[in-house]
């Protein structure tokens, strides 16, 4: 299945304002990260350069592990601020909300998908009581005709639906956030019969995810039921590991 591209449209004025806001946020994250690493290790590093190499990323995660030991409050704030700022830019880093596992039409996929984050509200005192509520709005833009059973879509049609995710800390005592969640390791996997080594740089947060999904009108609800039925209601919640390091990468790179 080909991955859907998420599209967004902004005016030139909005883009200019956004760029200024993003630059300020990224600069703040870089400065905070640099200060925490210096506090924990005594080293003053260029995080912009370090985060572009495997060795640099490993050293950064190791340094943040030390930082979490000596200053858990500010290290927690840094990691969660990076997550929130990334989400505000449209980067969630949670594959489930990209619907990669959904089975789309087998031949050609006659639509694109747009996603907009309406709000992303985060509250916490520590990782133990982290709680996030958000609203994501999606649009199917049909650029071709499609028909299957009682569902039809015409070129130019638009279908709209909203996703309401809730993200909380995993209550399992064995999955609580600790210094053991700062991971740098090599993993051997097979690709096309050949063994390759993959580097993993993770700061792992074990979360409990739940969400509801609703079409904005009857036709859109049919689209949801057709393509997203397995996602329509998951209010009981399930475990998912989220890599917090990717948000630092996203903002700094």
UniProtKB/Swiss-Prot annotation:
Covalently lipidated residues, kind N-palmitoyl cysteine: 26
Protein localization: Cell membrane
Lipid moiety-binding region (S-diacylglycerol cysteine): 26
One Gene Ontology cellular component: plasma membrane
Signal sequence segment: 1-25
Membrane topology type: Lipid-anchor
Keyword Membrane: yes
InterPro entries noted in UniProt: Lipoprotein_3
Main location: membrane
Any Pfam family: Lipoprotein_3
Keywords: Cell membrane, Lipoprotein, Membrane, Palmitate, Signal
Similarity comment text for this entry: Belongs to the MG439/MG440 family.
Name of the molecule in the record: Uncharacterized lipoprotein MPN_369
Taxonomy of the source species: Bacteria, Bacillati, Mycoplasmatota, Mycoplasmoidales, Mycoplasmoidaceae
